[in-house]
Amino acid sequence: MSIRDHSYYMTKAYQEALKAKKIGEIPVGAVIVNKDGDIVATGYNQTISSNDSSAHAEIVALRALGQRVSNYRFPDYSIYVTLEPCCMCAMALIHARLKNLYFGAYDLKTGACGSAFNLISDPKHNHKIIVEGGILKKECSALLSDFFKERRQSKKELKKIIQDFKSKLGSYKHFFSISF
């Protein structure tokens, strides 16, 4: 596949990530592509909305593909994900026997494909996935950075509202005092 092809599929994964952001989830998206270049499964983070800590974009996409093809191994498929997979997702990709992994942003804290760990390329595994990172890196990184910046700002604003409310409530304390 050419870089142009990679950009196309990563853009589709990015669009999935926007779905996660829209529902308040960490914006990570994934698409799985067959050997003919068709997108056959998609996923985005749904851990909060589904009350499922394993509902990362990659896992959601793998589950969708498994249901579609009635199998759990996908040796002729490639996955595009906007963020470097964590340990859980990296192992799921290995067990699924995917051929290629392409990701956007590097995850220096929990990335298991070379950034924080290199679990995916551990020589003990009997299946090797071809890995390429940094596809649409700026866009994918910015989506995550902006999300967390907005989240911090919202928390700050909420904290101020609560402090203001407590302050105002304190000045009316005598109205709420009940003596027995």
Name every feature range the model reports, one short phrase each.
Residues 1-23, 88-180:
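Zinc-dependent deaminase
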Residues 71-83:
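Immediate flanking context of iron-sulfur cluster ligation sites
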Residues 49-60:
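A short, polar/charged loop-to-alpha-helix boundary motif
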Residues 28-37:
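Short beta-strand scaffold segments in enzyme catalytic cores
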Residues 24-28, 75:
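Short, basic and Ser/Thr-rich N-terminal targeting/leader segments
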